[in-house]
Each structure stands twice: as structure tokens, then as C-alpha cells.
Amino acid sequence: PGVPDRAFINDIRADLHDTDTVYVALDNHKYGDFSPYLLVSKNRGRSWKKITNGIPDRHLVWRLVQDHVRPELMFAATEFGVFATFDAGKEWHKLSGGMPTISIRDIQIQRRENDLVAASFGRGFFVMDDYTALRDIDPDDFDTGAALFTPRDAYWYFQKRPLGYRPKGSQGDSLYLCLLYTSDAA
């Protein structure tokens, strides 16, 4: 729907949670068209729907990645940064977090730590550490202006000092031993 015939396919992603759903990111910038083209099919490609609401004009979409836990949470790498949707593409929101406004050409999720990794065009890569709080966002809560999230379990680290290991090393606090070895040249 509304995609030029000669648009280039940047990314095709099968839905991680629904075998009938597929996403496609396209661009037509070689013909002077910088519009975002991001489509979804919920019937294995027989029909398509555009899902770019909230992604501004002239923001090419390069890649798309879906959260492996919450199906509605997705991230799009665009010409001017990263966007997130919390409702399966009905509305997109720009993520910044100090990342410069640059072309993000690839985006992946590191599943073990739930990190979002975004690679730019010429500026390096950026990591959003442990984005699991984003899974708790309800799109209806955007009008409130603030939200509290449940933190993940954390470990409290206590340094163990079985032999003291203070200023005098393994000798404890009360004993300091210095040995000097010399060779007899007799």
C-alpha cells in the first residue's frame, strides 16, 4: 500500500511470536523518496498494512527487531535514530538517551542481558543496557508524564577478606614482615 514498485527491501523479519506475521522495511531514497516504508502482513504476505505512524517523513527505515518476550515491543533503526513501538506498530516513539541524531543502520537484541545494540553509519555503536523496563510500558500511560518500573533482581556484593587483606596484604593488620635476601660472595 503506497510503496513504489522499485523500492529497495532493507529488512524482512518474521514475527517471533506469530508464524503468520511478517514485517518488511523498504526505502526508495535512490529515487529521491525518503519516506519511511514499514509494512506488516498478518496473513503470510497476502495483504499488507503500513505501520509508520509516529515515524516522521524523511526517516528511512533500515532495520526492525522485535522483543523476544513482549510481542508488541519493537525497535526500528532509521536514518535519524531509533524508534520504539509498544503496541505492535500502531504508534512509534523516538528513543534518544543521549544517542546523537545519526543514521542507525543495524539493530539487534542481545537476549541474555536484554541489551538493545544499535550500529550507526560511521559513528560506532550504542548499547541500551537492560531495556526490560520498556516491556512494562503501557501506551495509555504516555499522558501521565512519569512512570515507575519494577527493577530486576540485583546482587549485593560484599568483598570477602579471609586473611585480612588490608594495608599489609595477607599478613593481617598486626604483622608486617620484610625479608631481604643477599648472596654471599665469599
Residue ranges and their predicted role:
Residues 181-186:
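Conserved small/polar residues in nucleotide/adenosyl-binding loops
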Residues 1-173:
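Beta-propeller blade termini and top-face loops
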